[in-house]
Swiss-Prot record:
Protein name: Tropinone reductase homolog At2g29370
Keywords: NADP, Oxidoreductase
Transmembrane segments: none
GO function terms (MF aspect): oxidoreductase activity
Active site: Y168
Enzyme class: oxidoreductase
InterPro entries: NAD(P)-bd_dom_sf (IPR036291), Sc_DH/Rdtase_CS (IPR020904), SDR_fam (IPR002347), TR (IPR045000)
Annotated positions binding NADP(+): 22-46
Source taxon at top rank: Eukaryota
Length: 268
């Protein structure tokens, strides 16, 4: 009988050749960067998004680069659509999935006392419930691959307070704990799970927010590296965690934040 993780350790350390991946929300931003990073390392990737036009534009870009990427439309807040997506993935990859990256996430910036029940339910469903459900649905496929990887796209909001993000932060904190639980519960199935927590990253979703000079300067002032991150600085970590080189890393919460979460008080 093979030892746990043996099949992964026997593969080339810095290649994802022969592996398959599902990345949700891959038509733009961090998700798109993750799709490209995994595909450039040799993985066959399936991704989804709600906007079919944007998805097709991205697909044309990937095809022009010779990347092995397929797409489908899916609203991950819908349980039925999540189940349909996983049926598609199972069919595409012959019942085996090497990598799961639930990337879709939304939030609302307002005081806790002003948040509505509808906002709470939608954010929980989109961020946390979908991640939990995708993990459940993917488990048999990840197990069948012989060496499965789950990378949850969390946030520093799940590690420290960001202010006026109580619902969003709660979902991300729960995702970090979910990764730890899955890492322990599914270790015997040769499935690893980790969570990645970005700080402010230059993406279409942060463009307007960071376009405010005062906001950007404030963000940079509390970041030791004194700059906002780039999408490929997050996607490279996600890809690394999926590589055979990272076969002994599981259950970890890793911040990609230019030092923000460890920045204490400095005397003048």
């Amino acid at each position: 009988m093979a030892k746990r993780g043996e099949s992964l350790r026997d593969k080339p350390k810095w290649s994802l050749e022969g592996m398959t991946a599902l990345v949700t929300g891959g038509s733009k931003g961090l998700g798109k960067a993750v799709v490209e990073e995994l595909a450039m390392l040799g993985a066959r990737v399936h991704t989804c998004a709600r906007d079919e036009t944007q998805l097709q534009e991205s697909l044309r870009e990937w095809q022009a680069k010779g990347l092995q990427v397929t797409t489908s439309v899916c609203d991950v807040s819908s349980r039925d659509q999540r189940e349909k997506l996983m049926e598609t993935v199972s069919s595409l990859f012959q019942g085996k999935l090497s990598i799961l990256v639930p990337n879709v996430g939304i939030g609302v910036l307002k005081p806790t006392t002003e948040c509505t029940a509808e906002e709470f339910s939608f954010i929980i469903a989109t961020n946390l419930e979908s991640t939990f459900h995708f993990s459940q649905l993917a488990h048999p496929l990840l197990k069948a691959s012989g060496s499965g990887n789950i990378v949850l796209m969390s946030s520093v909001a799940g590690v420290v307070n960001l202010g006026n993000t109580s619902i969003y932060g709660a979902t991300k904190g729960a995702m970090n704990q979910l990764a730890r639980n899955l890492a322990c519960e599914w270790a015997s199935d040769n499935i690893r799970a980790n969570s990645v927590c970005p700080w402010f990253i230059t993406t279409p979703s942060t463009k307007d927010f960071l376009g405010d000079k005062d906001v950007k300067e404030k963000v940079e002032s509390v970041t030791p590296l004194r700059r906002v991150g780039e999408a490929n600085e997050v996607s490279s970590l996600v890809a690394f965690l999926c590589l055979p080189a990272a076969s002994y890393i599981t259950g970890q919460t890793i911040c990609v934040d230019g030092g923000f979460t460890i920045n204490g008080f400095s005397l003048p």
